[in-house]
């Protein structure tokens, strides 16, 4: 009995020391610090989307021979061809299949392109939701310009997805359940893209980089 009573204080002490080990992870930044001003909201919710345009991972990127958008829009035509040099550059028949149009739905690289396009579309939709959640940081002009810029980026990625895959879903929110997602007719997606770009064009800022 005494042993059990003695064990209780030890258990309480051990639990108190364990609570001292609770630390705020240094590799994570609270959302309140990420979105604490108009500038930080732009950097993290708008400008960050441009990082995905020039991505270099396989299956990602709009430019460069990264087995992504550029390759599937160029090496599938007479515009360019990658010849096999002996056993080199065969890569499991990847480039030949592109040129011959003999890819399948199970091809990893083509699947990565689909994932890449919709990753940016979902992130763009999430950015629009984030801007609305923190609209108190912005004046009306900033809010309109931020959202217009994101909508323009998203429309561009919808265009590439429609151009490559035809009937694609148009997402209503970043948290939309997979079971609720439906394909849209290609003509409807095209109209959606045009309407988005026409709506945001007057709201986009005139400033641009020199790159």
What does each model-found stretch correspond to?
Residues 2-3, 69-73, 133:
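First exposed extracellular module after export/assembly in secreted or surface-exposed proteins
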Residues 39, 43, 51-56, 86-165, ...:
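Conserved, well-structured interaction surfaces
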């Amino acid at each position: 009995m005494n042993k059990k009573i003695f064990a209780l204080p030890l258990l309480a002490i051990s639990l108190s020391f364990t609570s001292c080990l609770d630390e705020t992870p240094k590799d994570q930044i609270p959302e309140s610090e990420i979105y604490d001003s108009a500038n930080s909201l732009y950097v993290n919710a708008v400008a960050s989307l441009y990082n995905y345009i020039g991505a270099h991972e396989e299956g990602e990127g709009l430019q460069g021979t990264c087995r992504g958008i550029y390759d599937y829009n160029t090496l599938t035509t007479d515009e360019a061809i990658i010849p096999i040099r002996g056993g080199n550059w065969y890569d499991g028949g990847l480039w030949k299949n592109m040129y011959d149009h003999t890819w399948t739905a199970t091809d990893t690289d083509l699947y990565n392109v689909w994932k890449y396009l919709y990753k940016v579309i979902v992130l763009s939709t999430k950015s629009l939701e984030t801007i609305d959640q923190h609209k108190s940081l912005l004046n009306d002009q900033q809010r309109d310009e931020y959202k217009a810029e994101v909508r323009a980026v998203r429309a561009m990625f919808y265009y590439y997805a429609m151009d490559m895959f035809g009937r694609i879903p148009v997402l209503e929110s970043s948290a939309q359940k997979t079971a609720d997602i439906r394909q849209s007719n290609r003509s409807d997606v095209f109209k959606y893209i045009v309407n988005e770009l026409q709506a945001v064009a007057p709201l986009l800022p005139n400033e641009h980089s020199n790159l």
